Amino acid sequence: MNRNCASPEEGGTTEQLVKEASDIVERDGFENKKKPPTLKLEHVEVVGEKSPTPATVYDLFKKYKKPDIVTNSNGDDMNVGFDQLSSDEKNGFLRKLQMLTVSSRKSVKVVGESTPSSAGRLLKKFAPSRKPTEKISVDEPPSRFNFFGRSTKKLSDSDRPSSLPKKKSARRLLFGKEEQKPEPEVVKNRVLPAMTSQQSAKGAPIPINKPYRYQGPRGSLETPTDSPAKISSNSSSSSPIPPVPTRNHFTSMNEESPSKKRTFSRQGLSNRDNLSNGSWHGELPPRDYTSPTFSRKIFVGGVPWDITEAALKDSFGEFGSCAVEWPGQEARYRSGQSNIAPLTNLRNQSKYAGQAATGYVYMIFEDERAVASLLHECSQEIGGAGEWYFKIRAQRSKSTEIRQVQIIPWVTSDSMFCEDESLLETGIEPKRTVFVGALHGMMTAQVLHWIMEDCFGSVECVQLDTDKFKYPIGSGRVTFREHGAYFKAIEMGYLHVHTSKFRKRVQIDPFLESTSCMVCTTESAQCFCRNRNCFKYYCHTCWAIDHGKDNADDVHVPVIVPSSASKAYAGPHRRPHLTSNSLSKSHGCSTNNQLSHVLSPGFPMIVGGPSQTLSALYGYIQNNQQMMLTPAVYETPMTPPSNESNAKRRSFTEFQNPAIFFNPSSMMTPQKSATCSETPVPAFFTNSAAFLTPNSNYYGSPNHSSSNISQSPQQYYGANLYYGYMPPQVAYDGSTNGSKLSPIHVPHIPNYQ
């Protein structure tokens, strides 16, 4: 009991004693809690480095404290008096303070951090740590891993390499070196921004996503520098294969909303400011679609030259009923006419004379879902422009060969591209529209829109022509917003498109329509002058008056208005079977079918007569159109080389009506605008061709009935088919001695349109 407490003998009551005792206990407990226990430290003399190292910073401050320094009465702060220390004391104080506060081996404990529990320490002991472990003694016993070139010895920080190479996955897209982050969540969050920034820096095209409203075709698949027997392209790549063979699953992960406006990052090397050579260089963007609608017709490239129709149907028939369409169907028509002109084609000398040795075919399915199922079984490459690859079986004499072929489907939404949807209702402006021909099969309407806009100016609308299967035929129309861009494209006349997949020479001509002569306004227009000074529709009479005095240096070449030379044919007389391989040798059998396949689908055809006094005509004859003219056959070459004398040249038979002349044998056809270095006559190229002669009252017609025969001869351009079309030979009867030819008269067909 404390002596301050009152005893009962001194007169204190029991209650007072208890109260005083409780107050003393509470006061003693409060004082014990307030005052920390005193640290018992040995006296250490300040002798520099020989002094023992203090345990804490508090001890260090207490060690260097001067007795004459006034401290805070509360004891919270301690003034060492650093300014009163000697230089040795300052250096020793700072060195010891650094040893206590900064340690390379011990981490500083954060204020408020809880002490790890026993479970946490156990987890930290067995869980893999990101920090390098301590170095193990070299004198450890040998391990079984040493026999295989491995050691259980762990590396220290100095022995460990700074950056170890990572394994690169074959399916992973690498966008440069990423900054290594210790936390995987941070690295994961950087993937999408890195992809976006890197693709923008490289100028990679953004995937094209088309709305459903567009209907689309594909162009011709021949390259102008190659023969028709070569396929258009062997190199291709495309985006990953969809998991389900339904059109709803042909969607890319990087796909945008169809309603969102898409841009195209061009990689072109030439633009409208660098178009002096008439070339455009660039890359096709990858194509991704949302719920595409495929054409029932597909392109199959890289097929063996001796592939049979049965082998193709056997390979593709598992996806649905299909038929084979040979390109151009030339060989099937030639096969029945070997008695007229012997052919040197290797295919026609073999048992496979019923097929065309072109290296590609077209497969036509009954249902578009069969195309989706086929694409599900195809392989692709990342970043392609719409090519797929499929393996077919080709039967050989002693074995079966597995051949990988190229599959190019066509999405019907690629036939039209208009930035302004109101044009679909109001229609396009013909006076700002050009006709483009010889388009490549990978050029969609949107791709053509970008190319023409990049070269000439703002484009309003692009439409591509298709066949009855909604498959492209290689031609289209481009409408510009301004007349300046329109005239610039017309004056250029052609455009060389260069990509890593193909090179194509695209022909550009004014889009012609049925109208009257702009001079007399009474006769219907038969031709159009594309020269900038004229740029009018003419009838034959007005053309002879306005252009009868043209000199050889300034020749205006007229463009034939298609409606004046041909009309659209509905097709009731077309061949009902896609693979029919015979042509009648008789005179009057299936003449209409012969003529319906003479015309090249969408290829530009220059037509004219081989007369020195005949001015050149050229124009386009559309697909599924038939000539409303009387044909005739001419045996010998129509345009011999320039070194031949005029005596060897044979003239046309004089007809009072327009006529088409076919040359069964190979002839020398001059390339338009290609001049020879030795003579002013254009360079010649071997090809077969068809010629259209004008009316008898036209200037320079074969019968020389025109009053303009006294005019000087003008340069003649023969048929130019750009290596993409070999017309079938037409059966005829009668002698070809001299200049006497027997024409084949076309029976009257009442259902011409």
From Swiss-Prot:
Record bears the keyword tRNA processing: no
Polar residues composition bias: residue spans: 265-279, 578-589
Compositional bias (Basic and acidic residues): 131-142, 175-188
Record keywords: RNA-binding
GO CC annotation: cytoplasm; neuron projection; nucleus; synapse
GO molecular function, one term: ribosome binding
Gene3D superfamilies (alphabetical): 3.30.70.330, Cytoplasmic polyadenylation element-binding protein, ZZ domain
Family annotation (CDD domains): Bbox1 (cd19757), RRM1_CPEB1 (cd12723), RRM2_CPEB1 (cd12725)
Gene Ontology biological process: negative regulation of cytoplasmic translation
InterPro entries: CEBP_ZZ, CEBP_ZZ_sf, CPEB, CPEB1_RRM1, Nucleotide-bd_a/b_plait_sf, RBD_domain_sf, RRM_dom
Disordered as annotated region, ranges: 111-286, 567-589
Residue stretches in coiled coil: none
Residue spans of biased composition, Low complexity class: 227-239
Domain RRM: 298-320
Pfam family, one: CEBP_ZZ
Function of the protein: Cytoplasmic polyadenylation element binding protein that binds to and regulates the translation of specific mRNAs.
PANTHER family tied to this protein: CYTOPLASMIC POLYADENYLATION ELEMENT BINDING PROTEIN CPEB (PTHR12566), CYTOPLASMIC POLYADENYLATION ELEMENT-BINDING PROTEIN 1 (PTHR12566:SF9)
Protein name (Swiss-Prot/TrEMBL): Cytoplasmic polyadenylation element-binding protein 3
Native source organism of the sequence: Caenorhabditis briggsae
Underlying gene: cpb-3
